[in-house]
Amino acid sequence: MEDYKQTLLLLISTPLYAVLIGLEMIMSSIHHKHLYTVKDTFTNVYLTSLNFGLELLIRTFCLGFLAYFFQFHFISIENPYLYWATLLILQDIAFYFEHRVDHYCRFFWAVHVTHHSSEKYNLTTGFRSSVFQPLYRFVYFIPLAIFGFKPLDIMFMYSATQIYGILIHTQYIKKLGFLEYFMATPSHHRVHHASNTIFLDKNMGMVFIIWDKIFGTFASEDDLKNEEIRFGLTKNIERPNHLVDIVFHEWVNIANDMKMNIPFTTKLKYLFMPPGWSHDGSRKTSKQLREELKGEL
């Protein structure tokens, strides 16, 4: 049954991606938007292949890990509609907190930064996967197993929501009316990928935006005044399509920071504090940058 469901997802998503990416490429060419380059697109596909390969390698371990916690579950939802709807909601909450940690802890940001490293923004940006994220993502699904959701169903739901998460990486869909109030839309996700100061570390949800509104990480595309939205990092890497640089550049930066002649506890802060933290104030976190911007207005 599991193979059937996973195969069905691939059979649906693969041609869907191909058609929509092809259409976006054509529209980009017609409108001279230059949303795509060959190198950037190839890099995105290559990175998602590495991510997918690692997921396959450790899939059995992840399922066994979650199965261990599933044996302690204390809730059973019998109604299948309620079961899948609840799993969707709880899985998206789990993703929200994983994503938030990825942005606010430099150790995990060093993994996740790969996804934000392109200055281009198109449907294939959703493929620009954080290569090593499968090594720890499943830990966030422990509560779902304890709440009575089967490990295979948890993994299936994550794969299904990933399809939606990829499709919102586009500049061609502007606003989606009332869906903007509770869904993570293309507009909301453009904010997430923006490097403009007011948008840093915002809009973490993959399917629903309500978690961002509840936990204070929401920003609207309309909040940006008198400047164009910029994609990428606050300091973009010199070789954005060089595999080693994309995957490891932040680890190199962390290593250089930890080589400084500072106390060991301070060294650890360079590993676990938010990106941009520095012991001497020479760099700033996203929160500090926003506060500084507010002071200038």
PLM segments and residue spans:
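Hydrophobic transmembrane alpha-helical segments in integral membrane proteins
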Residues: 1-17
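Helix-boundary and loop/linker segments of multi-pass membrane transporters
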Residues: 2-6, 34-40, 73-80, 114-115, ...
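Central hydrophobic cores of alpha-helical transmembrane segments in multi-pass inner-membrane proteins
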Residues: 16-28, 63, 88-94
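Membrane-embedded catalytic scaffold of the fatty acid hydroxylase/desaturase
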Residues: 49-61, 73, 77-229
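Hydrophobic membrane-embedded segments
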Residues: 65-73
